């Protein structure tokens, strides 16, 4: 029996956690494609890797069509709260994440990592 394969979106691929998640997804026989959505290149090359550059994660509406055929999103974008006011931290984590998630297909599995 053949392994079912999924298409996965990963954010935060230029950071420690996101890069690790992306590399594991690329190694997995259960993943047929990885779409890395980021502001800059990941610095990696792989046959399963596609990259999409999003200049402003606070205005992610342009990705709605790009992500429509994906099965899962592993959202690894984040910042440290050190030295940050609560309002700014909430905007950079909670608000940004919800805005991004709102662009995903209704049947997608969305995980905040």
What is each residue range found by the language model?
Residues 2-30:
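N-terminal Rossmann NAD(P)H-binding glycine-rich loop of SDR-like oxidoreductase domains
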Residues 35-40, 98-113:
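Conserved Rossmann-fold NAD(P)-dependent oxidoreductase catalytic core, especially the SDR/UDP-sugar
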